[in-house]
Structures are given as C-alpha cells and as structure tokens.
C-alpha cells in the first residue's frame, strides 16, 4: 500500500506545480480540471500524512518498550497508535478503490413522470429544478436537451445534460424511482397523495465509445408540441430517432433547429446504448461475484420526499433528513456523500470476499 501512497503524494506535488504554471493559468478549462482534482486529493493526502506520522510514532513507542521506567506509558501509547493505524488503513483503502472511468464524464439526466398524473409531472419539475440548483452549486453547466411540458407547468419528461469534470460520478446515485407524498394542487379534499418520477443518469457517450450504424437508425421529423399536445412550431423541427435493433426511441424538440435536435437525439441514443452495454457487463460481473453496483436499479424505489413531515428518506442506506426544503433547493451533498461512502463500503466488502 505504501507504494500507492507514494504515487498519490507525487501526483499531488505535480498538481501543485502545474497550478502555479503560467501556461496552465491561461487555459481555463485545464486549470479548473486540475483544481478540482487537487481539491479532491486534499482529504486523502491529509490521511496519508497522518498515517506516516502514526508509523513514526509507533516505531518510537516500540523502541521504548524495553525501558523499565517508560514501559507502561509506551505500551499504552502503542495500543492507541495501533488502533489509529488500523482506522487510517481502512480509510485509505476506501480512497484507493479503483474509480469508475466514466465518473469524470459529462452526464445525461432524464426525468419521467410516473404514477400520479399531473401531480407526478409537477414532481418531475421539482426534481428538475432541484438538480439545476445542485449543478450550479457544484460548478457544473447544464443544458436542456428535450422537454415535454404539461398544462400545469410540470414535465411528463425532461432530459438535460450536465457538463463538467466528475458530473456523471456526482449524479449517478440519483438513478431510480423517486416518490413524493403531499397534498397536490389539484386536490380539493386536502388528502395526501403519493406520486412518483423516474430518474435515469447516463454517462455521456463519445463517438469513439459507440459507433452508430446509420443503416440501423430511423429518423422521423415532426412539429414540436407543447402542453396538451398543441403545436408550438410551424416548422418540422422536432426529431424522433429509433434504433431498430433495440427499439430504443429518442425524441428532441427543444431547439428550433432540426439539425441541432438531430445531433442531440443521436447523442442521447449513443449514451443509452453505451449504458445498455455497461449494464450487461455489470450483470455479468455481478453473477460471477467480481463486483457489485451501488447506484440502485432503475425500477427500485430509492427515495421518498414527505411534505407533511418535511422529511427526505433515502431507502438504500436508511438516510433521513428533515430539511426537505433544503434538499429541494439543491443541497444534495450530504445525501450523495453518504451514498458514495456506502457504495465504497460495499466494494471493500466484495473485495474482502474475493
């Protein structure tokens, strides 16, 4: 393990040097990427330095065990240092877990209204706004790729891109069924209803990831539609792309340009096909007990937003907060950090089982 720690410290020193390099400072994109990596490494570097200090202190304590006058004190100190050493090793193991190479990619996020009619569409809008605020808080850029608004201002479906280093790794734990419990605006009796929305998060695929065979793709053009199915455009700018071998269908209508909608639709299709390929590989690995996925199945109910109790519960890890307003305002970091830690613990357990 010490060799890995040496390499991390060397990388950290190299990053420090690069961040003060005038050429790097001129390149905003590269500077931001290096700064993010430097900030990410801060915690593990602190742990490494503490670990090395514990090893030094442990060596010193053991050298005093033969001294009759200091033996008892050295013995007590040695026990405390051994306990701290073990705790630090567990923390470092977590940081040294292999990262998903897709984590640094941009993300495609799709939110679909589920059961609950118009209330589900309004909940989909709430989730969309929550993610936009969270993305802004994290320094990511967002762009709506496709949206289908409803009469009361909700969304039956909305797809958007999150751009920035680590976007997919940040958002991936949001995949699954989200449930809301509240009194809908359409409810006249004051009864609490339960509605759902499904979130899918995909790593953005690059052209080299998945070569699309255009002979296997059907592209239809149509007029964009608004709430209630009414036309909002007098030109055929909306695009529907169908991947014939899998039946995957993607529509895009947010741009007035048919060409831009076509490009966006193909990009989403490529990302879905890449995710399908990744899911098949993950299933194969899971069956052979070589890996586990901690991001939740899409059919699984992952989180409940209970308005009467101002409570948010993530069912995957039993995490509960009563700051519903804060969560919907985009303060997702405590939940996502807890999910990330639980995922790492599962990976460590899987490695321990061999």
UniProtKB/Swiss-Prot annotation:
Gene3D superfamilies: 3.30.160.20, 3.30.70.1660, 6.10.140.1950. Belongs to the prokaryotic/mitochondrial release factor family. SUPFAM superfamilies: Release factor. Keywords: Cytoplasm, Methylation, Protein biosynthesis. One of its GO terms (molecular function) is translation release factor activity, codon specific. Its main location: cytoplasm. NCBIfam families: prfA (TIGR00019), PRK00591.1 (NF001859). The gene is prfA. This is Peptide chain release factor 1. GO terms for cellular component: cytoplasm. Pfam families: PCRF, RF-1. The modification N5-methylglutamine is found at residue 230. The keyword Cytoplasm applies. Methylated by PrmC. Methylation increases the termination efficiency of RF1. It comes from the Bacteria. It comes from Thermus thermophilus (strain ATCC BAA-163 / DSM 7039 / HB27). Peptide chain release factor 1 directs the termination of translation in response to the peptide chain termination codons UAG and UAA. InterPro entries: PCRF, Pep_chain_release_fac_I, Pep_chain_release_fac_I_sf, Prokaryotic/Mito_RF, RF-1. It is found in: Cytoplasm.
């Amino acid at each position: 393990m010490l060799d890995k720690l040496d390499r991390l410290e060397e990388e950290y020193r190299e990053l420090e040097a690069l961040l003060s390099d005038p050429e790097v400072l001129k390149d905003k994109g590269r500077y931001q990427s290096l700064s993010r990596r430097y900030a990410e490494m801060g915690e593990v570097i602190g742990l490494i330095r503490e670990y090395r200090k514990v090893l030094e202190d442990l060596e010193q304590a053991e050298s005093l065990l033969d001294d009759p006058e200091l033996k008892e004190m050295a013995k007590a100190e040695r026990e405390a240092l051994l306990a701290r050493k073990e705790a630090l090793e567990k923390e470092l193991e977590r940081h040294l877990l292999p990262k998903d190479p897709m984590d640094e990619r941009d993300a495609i996020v799709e939110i679909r209204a589920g059961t609950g009619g118009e209330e589900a569409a309004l909940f989909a809008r709430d989730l969309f706004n929550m993610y936009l605020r969270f993305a802004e808080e994290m320094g990511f850029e967002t762009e709506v790729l496709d949206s289908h608004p409803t009469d009361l201002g909700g969304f039956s479906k909305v797809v958007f891109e999150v751009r920035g280093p680590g976007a997919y790794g940040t958002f991936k734990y949001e995949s699954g069924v989200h449930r809301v419990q509240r009194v809908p605006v359409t409810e006249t009796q004051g009864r609490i209803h339960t509605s759902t929305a499904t979130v899918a998060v995909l790593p953005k695929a690059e052209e080299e990831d998945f070569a699309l065979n255009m002979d296997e793709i059907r592209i239809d053009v149509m007029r964009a539609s608004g709430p209630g199915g009414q036309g909002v455009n007098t030109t055929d700018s909306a695009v529907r792309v169908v991947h014939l071998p899998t039946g995957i269908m993607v529509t895009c209508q947010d741009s007035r340009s048919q060409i831009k909608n076509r490009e966006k639709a193909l990009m989403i299709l490529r990302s879905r096909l890449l995710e399908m390929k990744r899911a098949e590989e993950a299933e194969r690995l899971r069956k052979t007990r070589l890996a586990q996925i901690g991001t939740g199945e899409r059919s699984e109910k992952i989180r409940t937003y209970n308005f009467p109790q101002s409570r948010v519960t993530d069912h995957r890890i039993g995490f509960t907060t009563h700051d519903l307003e804060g969560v919907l305002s985009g303060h997702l970091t405590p939940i996502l950090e807890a999910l990330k830690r639980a995922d790492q613990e599962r990976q460590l357990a899987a490695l321990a089982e061999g």
